[in-house]
């Protein structure tokens, strides 16, 4: 059973998810992506995803990740990665939980590669905005799942630019800050709740976000 849910608000700094940067050595970066070390980083990140959100099975399939570099990837003379930030978005299917797994990679000053899993699906929100928005999505789901005390984000789905309520037109593809909305599927105690999430820009380089809990 899925329920659809109107607005509470949060504020977060938005880091553009479409600001791509080239790597200093594309061939070396491709070699890194094909390495066993990289595979280990991915598998470790995926192991942290809650089992009710994603788990592997013998029929798991993936078309391979789409990589979006948001800060240039560089390498030192010894071949170690010295800087870089990027997303890897991995479409998966075959285990009754078809989705896109999102993994964030950031290279620290000591060349350590840190990984963080974002919420699965096609959300356009960055990690900071996801972190703030999820509290309101859980709050929305809890209004229906009152007996449940734990929720997870099962999936996110980007729905489009522009908002209906309040009426906010899309500012266009040439604009860095565009309002958009998504549907977040929340799972709690075996029940699924579809929660609309709205994201709209303010003049101070912040985004407001709202989660809905009113039935359509």
Q: Which role does the model predict for each range below?
A:
Residues 8-17:
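Bacterial N-terminal signal peptides
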């Amino acid at each position: 059973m899925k329920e659809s849910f109107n607005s509470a608000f949060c504020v977060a700094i938005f880091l553009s998810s479409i600001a791509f940067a080239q790597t200093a050595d594309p061939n070396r970066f491709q070699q890194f992506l094909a390495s066993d070390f990289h595979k280990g980083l991915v598998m470790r990140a995926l192991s942290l995803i809650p089992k009710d959100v994603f788990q592997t099975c013998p029929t798991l399939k993936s078309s391979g990740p789409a990589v979006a570099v948001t800060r240039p990837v560089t390498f030192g003379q010894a071949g170690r990665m010295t800087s870089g930030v990027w997303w890897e978005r991995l479409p998966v299917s075959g285990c009754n939980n078809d989705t896109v797994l999102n993994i964030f990679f950031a290279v620290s000053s000591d060349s350590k590669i840190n990984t963080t899993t974002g919420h699965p699906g096609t959300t356009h929100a960055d990690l900071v905005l996801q972190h703030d928005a999820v509290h309101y999505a859980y709050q929305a789901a809890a209004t229906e799942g009152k007996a449940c005390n734990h929720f997870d984000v099962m999936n996110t789905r980007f729905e489009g630019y522009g908002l209906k309520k309040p009426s906010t037109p899309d500012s266009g593809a040439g604009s860095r800050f565009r309002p958009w909305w998504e549907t977040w599927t929340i799972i709690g105690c075996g029940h699924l709740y579809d929660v609309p999430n709205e994201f709209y820009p303010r003049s101070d380089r912040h985004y407001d976000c709202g989660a809905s809990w009113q039935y359509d």
